[in-house]
């Protein structure tokens, strides 16, 4: 659509990567830590964002505190927009996870 919209976001909700849902009504972010581009002190979360007026209302979906952000989670929506799929290394090995939204 080539329409640009800016939204206000709290500092700790910054993510390294964002993606939009297939219907373009929601966004997801993969969080980050103080050493990543996001530079968030308490941002180790998979977030769901819903645009409301000029801000993004966030919902924390997955606590990523045991994830090493050298592996980027790279969140994606499932084609039916019911799940967010991401990768993580919670237990030392890389795995693919899904969280229902």
Where are these regions (language model features)?
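Conserved hydrophobic/aromatic "anchor" residues
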Residues: 1-2, 20, 29, 77, ...
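A short, hydrophobic secondary-structure junction motif
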Residues: 47-60, 77-86
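Blade-level signature of beta-propeller repeat domains, shared across WD40, Kelch, NHL, RCC1
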Residues: 72-101
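Conserved blade-ending motifs and adjacent loop-strand segments that build the rim/top face
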Residues: 8-19, 55-77
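Active-site proximal loops enriched in glycine and acidic residues that flank catalytic Cys/His/Asp
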Residues: 30-32, 50, 62-65, 88, ...
